[in-house]
């Protein structure tokens, strides 16, 4: 049975990696990311290959702290969140992803870590409804607490659903960012022994598509300039222990005032995992 599951993930990796016009049929995929642009950063050039894909944004991309809203040029957080959603829908539309394929859990940016239980429960419901063969999501790497919270929720939701699925969905990862020696690393993975990386060198047409998708995110231009256009990377998700740091040393988000530090995050993960497993996710 496990070989069958792995082959579905391998099939998706082959589909994402192929540079030809016809990569073949992709498995049924749900993309689950923390913010409305993370899927474009990590997989924008390949989303058009995922026919019928469902995209889930865990947060609305708007922190509650008013400074973020004002710096982005909006009077309220709701206006900022609405703009981020419209930017993302425009970008996804370029890849053939329709608005009805996109779902919002609508938690505030920087608050996913404090909502691990409700997020996991929502994902259990959605995965049960959609029944994907593969979930594409963030890795656990200490880059952004919302990214790590999303990874936690995906892995825990899959664990809670194992008894219901004949073939539980394979979890694959797209890239975001993390810190190495105090320097940001983008569009690559924190190494995990035994888990190889599929590197995709994008064609000229694919780079142009991704550039046009990036251009849709007017509010995020300063952020997106950190991410290269020419390459995307994917891998099978390792078996994480979310109660331990993803790497030694200072985590990327610990350099910023993003509402939480690593020790507190891991305490919340431990508490949420214990409660969810003891209650069966209910």
Language-model features and meaning:
Residues 1-32, 50, 99, 112-282:
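Metal-dependent de-N-acetylase/amidase catalytic core
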Residues 61, 107, 140:
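Flexible loop residues that form catalytic
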Residues 56-57, 106, 172-175:
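Short beta-strand segments
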Residues 58, 94-107:
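A conserved beta-strand->alpha-helix junction
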Residues 18, 22-79:
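ATP-dependent adenylation/pyrophosphate-handling site
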Residues 74-83, 196-201:
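A short acidic, glycine-rich active-site loop
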């Amino acid at each position: 049975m496990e070989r069958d599951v792995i082959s579905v993930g391998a099939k998706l990796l082959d589909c994402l990696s192929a540079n030809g016009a016809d990569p073949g049929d992709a498995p049924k995929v749900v993309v689950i990311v923390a913010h409305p642009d993370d899927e474009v950063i990590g997989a924008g050039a390949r989303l058009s290959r995922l026919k019928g894909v469902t995209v889930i944004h865990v947060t609305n991309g708007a922190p509650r702290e008013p400074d973020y809203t004002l710096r982005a040029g909006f009077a309220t957080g709701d206006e900022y969140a609405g703009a981020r959603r419209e930017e993302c829908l425009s970008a996804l539309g370029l890849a053939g992803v329709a608005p009805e394929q996109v779902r919002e859990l609508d938690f505030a940016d920087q608050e996913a870590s404090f909502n691990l239980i409700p997020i996991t429960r929502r994902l259990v419901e959605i995965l049960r409804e959609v029944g994907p063969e593969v979930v594409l999501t963030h890795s656990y790497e200490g880059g952004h607490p919302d990214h790590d919270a999303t990874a936690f929720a995906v892995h825990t939701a899959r664990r809670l659903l194992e008894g219901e699925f004949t073939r539980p969905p394979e979890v694959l990862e797209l890239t975001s960012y993390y810190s190495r020696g105090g320097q940001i690393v983008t569009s690559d993975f924190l190494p995990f022994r035994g888990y190889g990386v599929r590197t995709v060198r994008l064609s000229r047409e694919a780079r142009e598509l991704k550039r046009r998708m990036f251009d849709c995110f007017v509010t995020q231009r300063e952020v997106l300039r950190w991410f290269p256009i020419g390459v995307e990377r994917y891998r099978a998700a390792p078996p994480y222990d979310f109660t331990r740091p993803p790497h030694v040393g200072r985590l990327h988000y610990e350099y910023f005032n993003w509402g939480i530090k690593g020790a507190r995050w891991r305490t919340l993960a431990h508490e949420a995992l214990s409660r969810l497993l003891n209650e069966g996710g209910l």
